[in-house]
Amino acid sequence: MNRVCSIFSQLLKLFPRLEFEALVQQHKGERHARGFTCWDQFVAMLFCQLGGAQSLREICGGLAATEGKLKHLGVARAPLRSTLSYANQHRPWQLYESVFHQLRERCEAVVGSRKKFRFRNKLVSMDSTSIDLCASLFDWSRYKRTKGAAKVHLLLDHHGYLPSFACITDGKTSDIQVARQFQFAPGTVVVMDRAYVDYDWWQRLTQQGVFFVTRFKSDLRHEVVEERAVPQNRNIRADQVVRLSAITKAGAQSTLYRRIVLWVEDKQEEMAFFTNHLDWGATTVTSVYKDRWQIESFFKSVKQLLRVKTFVGTSPNALKTQIWTALIALLLLKYLQLRSTFGWSLSNLCALLRQQLFVYRDLFPWLNDPFQPPPALADWHDRQLTLEWSAS
């Protein structure tokens, strides 16, 4: 049994200090720093997420209340509220973006080889979620007269359901603006909703050998080139090869696409799907789109389990720092979930971990059997050294 450091300390050991300090040097994170290091800031913000703190007072007070256990975290003392606030406002949020990608690589190393679909293509979902902000406090985020918002754009890799890319923008930035900046490897399958309609971009993806699956918009003008046979007893109403009728900046559309119509029994309605993959079966296309709910589940976990609704700073830098540390915390939970044999749900793991942060127990034995009591301490007399007297 580990009697010398807390579970929180063992979690922090998953972020090697040498690698962290290399990132600090890379981003010049401690330029003009006076005692309060980037590691101190990272520990405080990770405690905010895992401990459920909702304000600077709760972060600093919570750490101060465990003063005797801070040395195992690599922290000399609990920060002052003004010190942490200043660091969140001025230190580069890009540091925590790099920490996020380092942890993502560690998570990918423990993901198994089993896949849900038979095809070998890399499958990713693309979507965004809005975080409502008070326009009077976050004036830089205003996109309507009385409303402010920030957006988190995400690529979710379906192999392990891990985020592979994230981008934080203001509420004015449209989803397709961010999507145009992504670079996908040939053969990648991108699943997205109807917010990503751009004929030229679709054609460019097809030319690059990138496949996509999305919902078909009813106002999408097209002509049917071929009607394909539909499978029996699969609720597929139509499988068509189509060509878009719109004239775009690149000229007339010559690329062929597929339009697949599915009858949804539960809702008693038709759903139409759109893809540039001409060889898959119709049921494969619909199943791939159905798996897109995983990215919705990821966003739901971020908003429900972590602190992204109340913020401890109002500047763009402070907000991005808090969102990136929230993504790091969720990725950390995913890593623990992958390493554990217990079968945790993310919500249950987050709730119990919050109660155990400063408990002195071995992390992974606890993860694998959380309700097993820790090994009993050996009897004091058994552990006491004996002093033998020699006859003289």
Language-model-derived ranges and their functions:
Residues 1-58, 62, 91, 98-101, ...:
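Single, function-defining residue in the core of a domain
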Residues 73-90:
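Major-groove recognition helix of helix-turn-helix-like DNA-binding domains
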Residues 141:
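A glycine- and small-aliphatic-rich helix-loop capping segment at beta-alpha/alpha-beta transitions
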